[in-house]
Amino acid sequence: FIAGTRVAQIDGTTIYADRNSTNGSSATSQTIRFLGPTTAYTSPASTKSILVGGTFANNTNNSVNLTLEIYDSSVGVTSTGSVAIASKIPVPAGSSFVISDTGKTVLESGDELRIYCDSTNAIDASLSILTGVS
């Protein structure tokens, strides 16, 4: 499945996703890991914040894939409620991924920065955020 695919329904032993797989072979008898997002930051109520930059360090001995997403709280949980700002970025063991300060991301009241990783507890995040913007 491509990045951003979500489980739409679980019916007994069958799992349905919100889009088709790019894999043409059968997926029976395979192990599936359900790793959800970690909300790294939520913009405070009645104000805006600006994501200036961030460093996401791999603290494991294996390469991991990282996805960063902005959840727009004004839209809610829909297919348009989240926008990936980095999708399936490979982060080698002992390395990091950096969001540079060349582009800023405005977070409105209640918006969230979410981090997805394909391994549990594999990423340490350090964020630079300007808060209290009106």
Describe each region flagged by the PLM.
Residues 35-59, 67-68, 74, 109-110, ...:
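C-terminal interaction-tip segments
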Residues 1-37:
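Small/polar beta-strand repeat architecture
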Residues 14-16, 65, 124:
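General beta-strand recognition
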Residues 1-3, 103-106, 119-121:
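Short, charged beta-turn/beta-strand-edge "cap" motif at the junction between a beta-strand
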Residues 73-112:
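Intrinsically disordered, low-complexity Pro/Gly/Ser/Thr-rich segments with frequent PxxP/GP/PP motifs
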Residues 6-8, 16, 41-42, 90, ...:
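Generic structural detector for well-ordered beta-strands
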